[in-house]
């Protein structure tokens, strides 16, 4: 007799079997490469792709969407073009192009995607995902620039002061010492690092030779500056897209420190090469070209990058409401941080009225203009004080420096004018002769060797001698000898009562008296 099959049992067995089946389907949007050339791929089938979205090819290479057209998307490749061919499949990642930033990046050399390229292994530490492109903080979340960023360069700190949160352009022809000013500024932050209040430095090398970047990293290591510095490098052999995105990676790393209540300095060396890389990418993407074949939004490229430098309001509850804050940063936000930018632009034959230089001059808060003639005369740093300016740094300058060097810029301008007249010969009255003598000696005082930034208190001391005419008896060729002896005397005999007080920004009659007495005693014939 056959067993009767119960309907209830069958249904329960079927139910158990069906419950064990995984019916979830993972949907991935996949496209196909239609065409690839010169670092740009045209892809069909990614109808929902977003601008600046990261795409991934089968071989692991990544690309970033830049053009959204009716029937295809144009994406820039972040790797060699020859590794991608027509017909390859591409998938969306759903992520906007970003970089994973962590404390472990400090002291490392990375590419614009955050991958280490210094051969020291992977980067460790908790990471925060920071978007490469991000809106700058609104006016509500900023405060005025009021804290100095000491460069250690006498001519800059005295006449063209830079504040934390400022954008100061360094502009000049090739081989005039633009990078040297930026590197000296980074080296000068060593004292802040040792005092426990570091200014984290990000040096972005765009389109430079690999050997140049290696030599620069070596210099920073020798001076102990890599302890608080990150180098982002996109060399001349890297794809144009990497050179284009490198400054955005530097800004994203700087924002990580800025938004967590710390101070950062980012150097873009140089934005002329970024503009050329962007022009190359835009032309291959067949975007309409404008003046000098640059795309129409080249101004917006630099303005949106440099606007990200800011001094954040010192109220954490307000700072936490900052616009476009990445989710990974929400619980780390503190107020009072800053991001200072030093963009570098290379001019051709001193032409500051060219397209890209005028754009960046109008975006930044001032410029340091370097001249080939001054450089060749031995006036280094070769700063043309007449057309160099700092529009907001004056509010951040130390009071002692402002008192001592307040007239230095005008004095030097008058000296240059009188000097050009004196070349015609003829007799000079005593006042003119004194002005020229003082100007020549001040010019000598402002000359400074490379990689030897000077603490601000020593700058104030020696510039006091120059501006007050205390070098009247010192021969012109002995000014540097006097400077070395004078500063050595202050370090050995007046560290606490003069230098330490000047460091706080205070100068009084007692200190003035000591400085004048020391200068006179030092040069007694």
Swiss-Prot record:
It comes from Parabacteroides distasonis (strain ATCC 8503 / DSM 20701 / CIP 104284 / JCM 5825 / NCTC 11152). The keyword Translocase applies. ATP binds at residues 172-179. Its EC number is 7.1.2.2. GO terms for molecular function: ADP binding; ATP binding; proton-transporting ATP synthase activity, rotational mechanism. F-type ATPases have 2 components, CF(1) - the catalytic core - and CF(0) - the membrane proton channel. CF(1) has five subunits: alpha(3), beta(3), gamma(1), delta(1), epsilon(1). CF(0) has three main subunits: a(1), b(2) and c(9-12). The alpha and beta chains form an alternating ring which encloses part of the gamma chain. CF(1) is attached to CF(0) by a central stalk formed by the gamma and epsilon chains, while a peripheral stalk is formed by the delta and b chains. It is a peripheral membrane protein. PROSITE patterns: ATPASE_ALPHA_BETA (PS00152). Produces ATP from ADP in the presence of a proton gradient across the membrane. The alpha chain is a regulatory subunit. It is an enzyme of class 7 (translocase). This is ATP synthase subunit alpha. It catalyses: ATP + H2O + 4 H(+)(in) = ADP + phosphate + 5 H(+)(out). SUPFAM superfamilies: C-terminal domain of alpha and beta subunits of F1 ATP synthase, N-terminal domain of alpha and beta subunits of F1 ATP synthase, P-loop containing nucleoside triphosphate hydrolases. HAMAP family: ATP_synth_alpha_bact. Keywords: ATP synthesis, ATP-binding, Cell inner membrane, Cell membrane, CF(1), Hydrogen ion transport, Ion transport, Membrane, Nucleotide-binding, Translocase, Transport. It comes from the Bacteria. The record marks 388 as: Required for activity. Its main location: membrane.
């Amino acid at each position: 007799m056959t067993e009767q099959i119960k309907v209830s049992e069958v249904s329960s067995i079927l139910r158990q079997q069906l419950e064990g089946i995984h019916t979830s389907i993972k949907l991935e949007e996949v496209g196909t490469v239609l065409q690839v050339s010169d670092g740009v791929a045209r892809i069909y089938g990614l109808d929902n792709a977003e601008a600046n979205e990261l795409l991934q090819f089968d071989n692991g290479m990544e690309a970033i969407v830049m053009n959204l057209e009716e029937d295809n998307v144009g994406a820039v490749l972040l790797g060699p073009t020859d590794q991608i061919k027509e017909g390859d499949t591409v998938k969306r990642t759903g992520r906007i192009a970003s970089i994973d930033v962590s404390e472990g990046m400090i002291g490392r050399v990375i590419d614009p995607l955050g991958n280490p390229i210094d051969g020291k292994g992977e980067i460790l530490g908790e990471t925060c995902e920071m978007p490469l492109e991000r809106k700058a903080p609104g006016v509500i979340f900023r405060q005025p620039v009021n804290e100095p960023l000491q460069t250690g360069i006498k001519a800059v700190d005295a006449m063209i002061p830079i504040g934390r949160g400022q954008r100061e352009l360094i502009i000049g022809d090739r081989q005039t010492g633009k990078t040297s000013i930026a590197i000296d500024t980074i080296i000068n932050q060593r004292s802040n690092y040792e005092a426990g209040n570091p200014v984290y430095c990000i040096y972005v090398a765009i389109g430079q030779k690999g050997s140049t970047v290696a030599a620069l990293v070596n210099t920073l290591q020798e001076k102990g500056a890599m302890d608080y510095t990150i180098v982002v490098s996109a060399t001349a052999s890297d794809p144009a897209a990497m050179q284009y995105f490198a400054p955005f990676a530097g800004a994203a790393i700087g924002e990580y420190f800025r938004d967590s209540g710390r101070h950062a300095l980012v150097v873009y060396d140089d934005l002329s090469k970024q503009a050329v890389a962007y022009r190359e990418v835009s032309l291959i993407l067949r975007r309409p070209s404008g003046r000098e074949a640059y795309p129409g939004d080249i101004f917006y490229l630099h303005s949106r990058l440099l606007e990200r430098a800011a001094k954040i309001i010192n109220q954490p509850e307000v700072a936490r409401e900052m616009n476009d804050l990445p989710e990974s940063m929400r619980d780390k936000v503190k107020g009072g941080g800053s991001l200072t930018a030093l963009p570098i632009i290379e001019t051709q034959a001193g032409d500051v009225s060219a397209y890209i230089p005028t754009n960046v001059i109008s975006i930044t808060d001032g410029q340091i203009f370097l001249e080939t003639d001054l450089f060749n005369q031995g006036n280094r740093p070769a700063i043309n004080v007449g057309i160099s300016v700092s529009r907001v740094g004056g509010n951040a300058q130390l009071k002692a420096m402002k008192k001592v060097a307040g007239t230095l810029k005008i004095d030097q301008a008058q000296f240059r004018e009188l000097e050009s007249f004196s070349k015609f010969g003829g007799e000079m009255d005593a006042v003119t002769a004194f002005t020229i003598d003082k100007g020549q000696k001040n010019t000598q005082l402002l000359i400074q060797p490379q990689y030897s930034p000077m603490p601000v208190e020593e700058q104030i001391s020696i510039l006091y001698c120059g501006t007050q005419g205390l070098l009247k008896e010192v021969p012109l060729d002995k000014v540097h000898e006097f400077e070395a002896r004078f500063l050595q005397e202050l370090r050995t005999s007046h560290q606490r009562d003069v230098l330490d007080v000047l460091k706080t920004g205070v100068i009084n009659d007692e200190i003035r008296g000591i400085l004048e007495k020391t200068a006179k005693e030092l040069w007694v014939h």
